[in-house]
From Swiss-Prot:
Subcellular location: Secreted
Assigned keywords, A-Z: Carbohydrate metabolism, Disulfide bond, Glycoprotein, Glycosidase, Hydrolase, Polysaccharide degradation, Secreted, Signal
Species this protein is from: Penicillium expansum (Blue mold rot fungus)
Gene that this sequence comes from: lacA
Known glycosylation sites: N156, N374, N403, N625, N763, N780, N917
Protein's name in the database: Probable beta-galactosidase A
Amino acid sequence: MKLLSSLALAALAAQVSGAAISHKLDGFTLREHADASKRELLQKYVTWDKHSIFINGERLMMFSGEVHPYRLPVASLYIDVFEKIKALGFNCVSFYVDWALLEGKPGHYTAEGIFDLQPFFDAAKEAGIYLLARPGPYINAEVSGGGFPGWLQRVNGTLRTSIGDYLKSTDNYASHIAKTIAKAQITNGGPIILYQPENEYSGACCGYEDFPDGSYMQYIEDHARDAGIVVPFISNDAYAGGHNAPGTGKGAVDIYGHDGYPLGFDCANPSVWPDGNLPTNYHTLHEEQSPTTPFSVVEFQGGAFDPWGGVGFAKCAHLLNHEFERVFYKNDFSFGVTFFNLYMIFGGTNWGNLGHPGGYTSYDYGSAISESRNVTREKYSELKLLGNFAKVSPGYVVANPGNLTTSKYTKTADLTVTPLLGESSSAGSFFVIRHSNYNSQASVKYQLTLPTSAGELTIPQLGGELTLSGRDSKIHVTDYDVAGSNILYSTAEVFTWKKFDNGKVLILYGGPGEHHEFAVTGASASSVIEGSSSGITSKKIGDALVVAWDVSSKRRIIKIGDLKVFLLDRNSAYNYWVPHLPTKGKAPGYVSKKAIDSSIIVKAGYLVRSAFLSGKDLHIQADFNATTPIEIIGAPSSAKNLVINGKKTKTNVDDNGIWSASVSYSTPEIHLPSLKDLKWQSIDTLPEVKNSYDDSAWTSADQPHTLNTAHELQTPTTLFSSDYGYHTGTLLYRGHFVANGKESIFFIQTQGGSAYGHSVWVNETYVGSWEGSGSNDNYNATYTLPSLATGKKYAITVVIDNMGLDVNWVIGQEGMKNPRGIIRYNLAGHDASAISWKLTGNLGGEDYRDTVRGPLNEGGLYAERQGFHQPKPSTKNWDSSSPFTGLTKPGIRFYSASFDLDLPSGYDIPLYFNFGNSTAPPDAYRVQLFVNGYQYGKYVNNVGPQTSFPVPEGILNYHGTNWIALSLWAQQESGAKLNSFELINTTPVLTSLDKVKSVDQPKYKSRKGAY
């Protein structure tokens, strides 16, 4: 561990005075001041002041996006996501760790294979991305239990408090995960620069009054420090509440941060921006709550979740689109945010039952990078404009935010301007303009009156007016430094600038139909060296050359001394990329002034991942979804050849030194199997309803008391599944009784989370189902029973679809302890105690059998308990029948088939399994989709909305055999079948991505003790 020397440690201990906190670290005792704002640093790499974070002594704007490694279980695809984030101009990624996946059994921590975090850390380092680690223990994250393993339902104590045994239950996980993270800190050459203890520790209810509990937070922080965490602690208050900010005493973090989801989650109305939802007081609150730390928004809305029965993530992407980014993100910039993390930048998939019941399999989130990892959403391109601007604008980081005004800088109250002023008139200032009614769709003409080093100027100076279109916002700059050239002002926005061997380049852009103006101090003349001069005028005013221009879809370049100004429309700017050009090797390295200065500008299409120089060859690694013209702006003088994705490419060089080339794209031939024509084999996966079924191997539900402290029993023995170690997937119950002839009805209340369902049989007679809805997490059902023979033994079989455990966002509410299973029941003519119950879930419960795919992937269906969802199941005694034929009565059937793929190499080809439904109203049935043993889809036909399930390469074998399996659960008298089920692809992307490695896919083998 590259920590402090023993001498430095001793000196540090001697320096700290007052009430102190002790940590054991590498054999030394460290004592920290209880007040985080007065602590000495434990390392020298990551520091901060009121403006920003410093890394290795260099002040940085941290632009970050949220990625969850557990939602993409293919390690060789991590680099793809990181490179796409790096290409945005970002320099950081935040990630959660899901405790429930790593300690499925109390005391048994395992983080191997797809759950190993080291490949994630390695990919971040390779891409040059810093990391913020957020291991909880509580994470929320729309995962089952908010990241809590199901066995916490049995913990005697209040979750997320010091009450009872909760904190003790976190010890094993907390120490293991913190040690893993500690090894990957920047102090050890790793990418991790910040650590967040707990998550959104921001509110309590239900009689819990000791909030916020500094001792509770301190316990979590101590665990991290004791395990070797030396990077700064940062928080993410759910709102700007000041909880655990520096100076608040025990449990205070080093850097205070908060979240913001101001537009909400109404994806059903994607064009509606409600009045009053734009934050206006973030800076004021920051100055009140944590003025000595950089303003940090640790989660800001990058998309939205969508519930069962929702409208789908396409509409969420529309709600939180490029217009949202322009208005809301620039508004955050107006407050001087310098740690800015977007939740999510890539959402991924809730595979293997890892999601909470409020969401379905997809966790696309409407984010900039889609679930299938494509970057075709306009919001990705818009974000690239802002990310690259932030990267080349060091003056922004130290500018001082002022108060918003509708009169000081413009003459119309329809517009609001918030200034970020430099320390002096020549230090560079930024002015964020938006509609006063932020949701206005009107187009407003305006002029600006701005302070500059040349005095106060009214702009445009050469006539005309500026325009702010509806749902738009701009950042105007004054005294903006471009490698020694002073841009006195620019009304057009800056994308990037660079100083090259042959001069400087500045790229400005504007919206369609806009008029803009910029001025360059000390310049006297300009010339248009590319494109038409129509719509461009210039004039020397005072010591500056003023240039006015009308936005055009055709690029113009103006030369002013050694400065070339590229004038673009916004859509054209989307095609520009600014990859770092490392001075040695291929890896781009982390962001630094040196890395920024050595970058080149590439005009391309779909994606530019990276660039590097090898001898006289300039290499560009890029992806293409169409034939694309390429331009290199600022190629090093030592470069003589252009190599794109390993192929030397013919180039032309124009009079301005711009290299041009072209990459041809042709759609490859892709042959996908017809799933309807596969050789399907099937088996009844509900043998439990047969009179001959023997459930003697099942768990007896005979505990007279529940260990769940949040819910009282309403049954003679507990039927809460987690009391018996079953926390995931389908649950089955069998209740045995002797009939007395009075059994006219059966009442049952079950609980399984949103969109869950249940079905009930008495012996082999189907009596009914709750088909599910997006709004019910439990249901009371009363069923009429057939006449039963007095004195005969009967079994009631209840199948319950567990949709995941609830999150525990509000302390004291104990949402995670909401049980799954049977809550209460009544059989007419019998006392409740007359029924003796057995239950099962996944085979082994917490002693789960498939340690490769983890503790949540399997549920309790017979086929799952046997392992038939894995590749090459034993189908000797199965039937030859297809899910397209399905069932003719209520029940559950399991289907398995295989197919081969041999897809073209060199392409990233997104594949989807699509379910179709042509009936109205929709038939009531449920399907689980397993791909090579991984549950990669949970489809509820009558609830929705998800019908298309992307499965990444690595789970699917693109060059080999694949096994798919389906469980088809019919919840209606007529049975169910699949009307349509297809494997489809979207546009193949010609890619420079390295070959994707398939994850471990253990094949079926007979399971000892399976029943």
